[in-house]
Regions:
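Membrane-proximal N-terminal amphipathic helix
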Residues: 28-60
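C-terminal juxtamembrane segment of a hydrophobic transmembrane alpha-helix
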Residues: 4-10, 14-33, 54
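Periplasmic/extracellular, small/polar-rich flexible segments of pilin-like filament-forming proteins
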Residues: 55-145
Length: 145
Protein backbone atom coordinates (compact mmCIF):
# COMPACT_ATOMS: atom_id res chain seq x y z
CA UNK A 1 0.00 0.00 0.00
CA UNK A 2 1.07 3.50 -0.66
CA UNK A 3 1.39 6.23 1.91
CA UNK A 4 -1.89 7.84 0.84
CA UNK A 5 -3.79 4.61 1.31
CA UNK A 6 -2.30 4.07 4.79
CA UNK A 7 -3.13 7.64 5.74
CA UNK A 8 -6.74 7.21 4.57
CA UNK A 9 -7.01 3.92 6.48
CA UNK A 10 -5.73 5.50 9.72
CA UNK A 11 -7.98 8.51 9.24
CA UNK A 12 -10.98 6.23 8.68
CA UNK A 13 -10.21 4.26 11.86
CA UNK A 14 -9.92 7.49 13.88
CA UNK A 15 -13.25 8.78 12.54
CA UNK A 16 -15.03 5.49 13.30
CA UNK A 17 -13.51 5.45 16.81
CA UNK A 18 -14.72 8.99 17.51
CA UNK A 19 -18.19 8.12 16.24
CA UNK A 20 -18.36 5.13 18.59
CA UNK A 21 -17.29 7.24 21.60
CA UNK A 22 -19.86 9.95 20.79
CA UNK A 23 -22.55 7.28 20.39
CA UNK A 24 -21.76 5.74 23.77
CA UNK A 25 -21.91 9.16 25.47
CA UNK A 26 -25.23 9.98 23.79
CA UNK A 27 -26.66 6.63 24.89
CA UNK A 28 -25.56 7.18 28.51
CA UNK A 29 -27.13 10.66 28.61
CA UNK A 30 -30.35 9.38 27.06
CA UNK A 31 -30.45 6.52 29.56
CA UNK A 32 -30.16 8.98 32.48
CA UNK A 33 -32.97 11.17 31.06
CA UNK A 34 -35.19 8.13 30.50
CA UNK A 35 -34.63 7.04 34.11
CA UNK A 36 -35.44 10.55 35.39
CA UNK A 37 -38.66 10.54 33.34
CA UNK A 38 -39.56 7.14 34.80
CA UNK A 39 -38.92 8.36 38.35
CA UNK A 40 -41.11 11.42 37.73
CA UNK A 41 -43.85 9.24 36.24
CA UNK A 42 -43.79 6.91 39.27
CA UNK A 43 -43.67 9.86 41.67
CA UNK A 44 -46.65 11.57 40.01
CA UNK A 45 -48.56 8.27 40.17
CA UNK A 46 -47.81 8.02 43.91
CA UNK A 47 -48.81 11.67 44.39
CA UNK A 48 -52.14 11.15 42.63
CA UNK A 49 -52.71 7.99 44.71
CA UNK A 50 -52.16 10.09 47.85
CA UNK A 51 -54.61 12.71 46.59
CA UNK A 52 -57.19 10.01 45.83
CA UNK A 53 -56.68 8.46 49.27
CA UNK A 54 -57.22 11.81 50.99
CA UNK A 55 -60.56 12.25 49.18
CA UNK A 56 -61.93 8.82 50.17
CA UNK A 57 -64.29 8.47 53.10
CA UNK A 58 -62.86 6.59 56.08
CA UNK A 59 -65.28 3.72 55.46
CA UNK A 60 -63.66 3.10 52.07
CA UNK A 61 -60.06 3.20 53.31
CA UNK A 62 -59.56 6.95 53.39
CA UNK A 63 -58.02 8.99 56.17
CA UNK A 64 -59.44 8.80 59.68
CA UNK A 65 -61.23 11.79 61.14
CA UNK A 66 -58.72 14.57 61.71
CA UNK A 67 -56.13 13.08 59.35
CA UNK A 68 -54.96 14.86 56.20
CA UNK A 69 -52.42 14.50 53.38
CA UNK A 70 -49.58 14.63 55.89
CA UNK A 71 -50.74 11.33 57.38
CA UNK A 72 -50.39 9.39 54.12
CA UNK A 73 -47.96 6.50 53.83
CA UNK A 74 -47.33 3.76 51.30
CA UNK A 75 -49.49 1.27 53.20
CA UNK A 76 -52.50 3.59 53.22
CA UNK A 77 -52.40 4.12 49.44
CA UNK A 78 -52.02 0.40 48.74
CA UNK A 79 -48.43 0.37 47.53
CA UNK A 80 -46.48 -2.27 49.43
CA UNK A 81 -47.03 -3.24 53.02
CA UNK A 82 -44.58 -0.98 54.80
CA UNK A 83 -44.81 2.68 55.56
CA UNK A 84 -41.15 3.66 55.23
CA UNK A 85 -40.36 3.10 51.59
CA UNK A 86 -41.31 1.69 48.22
CA UNK A 87 -39.05 0.35 45.45
CA UNK A 88 -39.50 -0.72 41.85
CA UNK A 89 -37.23 -1.20 38.83
CA UNK A 90 -36.84 2.58 38.36
CA UNK A 91 -35.73 3.43 41.90
CA UNK A 92 -36.80 3.77 45.50
CA UNK A 93 -39.22 6.26 47.02
CA UNK A 94 -39.74 7.72 50.48
CA UNK A 95 -42.55 9.86 51.90
CA UNK A 96 -41.75 12.75 54.23
CA UNK A 97 -44.88 14.00 56.01
CA UNK A 98 -45.58 17.68 56.47
CA UNK A 99 -48.44 19.73 57.86
CA UNK A 100 -51.29 18.86 55.51
CA UNK A 101 -48.87 17.84 52.77
CA UNK A 102 -46.19 15.29 51.87
CA UNK A 103 -42.90 15.25 49.98
CA UNK A 104 -42.08 12.16 47.93
CA UNK A 105 -38.38 11.61 47.22
CA UNK A 106 -37.34 9.28 44.39
CA UNK A 107 -33.78 8.00 43.95
CA UNK A 108 -32.48 5.65 41.27
CA UNK A 109 -29.84 4.28 43.65
CA UNK A 110 -26.83 5.20 41.52
CA UNK A 111 -24.05 7.63 42.42
CA UNK A 112 -22.09 10.28 40.57
CA UNK A 113 -23.18 11.49 37.15
CA UNK A 114 -25.72 8.69 36.77
CA UNK A 115 -27.69 9.60 39.91
CA UNK A 116 -31.22 10.91 39.54
CA UNK A 117 -33.09 12.51 42.44
CA UNK A 118 -36.72 13.51 42.05
CA UNK A 119 -38.75 15.48 44.60
CA UNK A 120 -42.55 15.68 44.42
CA UNK A 121 -44.52 17.90 46.80
CA UNK A 122 -48.25 17.24 47.28
CA UNK A 123 -49.95 20.23 48.95
CA UNK A 124 -53.62 19.57 48.21
CA UNK A 125 -56.06 17.62 46.10
CA UNK A 126 -56.09 19.82 42.99
CA UNK A 127 -54.00 19.00 39.93
CA UNK A 128 -51.84 22.10 40.37
CA UNK A 129 -51.04 21.16 43.99
CA UNK A 130 -48.31 18.78 42.80
CA UNK A 131 -44.83 20.28 42.35
CA UNK A 132 -41.83 18.38 40.94
CA UNK A 133 -38.10 19.04 41.12
CA UNK A 134 -35.64 16.93 39.11
CA UNK A 135 -31.94 16.77 40.03
CA UNK A 136 -32.09 20.21 41.63
CA UNK A 137 -32.41 21.64 45.08
CA UNK A 138 -34.30 19.32 47.39
CA UNK A 139 -37.85 19.99 48.51
CA UNK A 140 -37.34 19.20 52.19
CA UNK A 141 -40.58 20.47 53.67
CA UNK A 142 -43.97 21.68 52.59
CA UNK A 143 -47.06 23.45 53.84
CA UNK A 144 -50.63 22.88 52.75
CA UNK A 145 -52.36 25.42 50.55
Amino acid sequence: MGQQQLLLLVLGIVIVGLAVVVGIQAFSENQKKANADSLVNDGIRLASDIQAWSLKPEAFGGPAAGDDLGDADFGSIGVGTGTTGYSNTNGSFEITPGTGCVVITGDNGLTGDKQNLVYISVRGTAQDNIETQINGSAITSCTAE
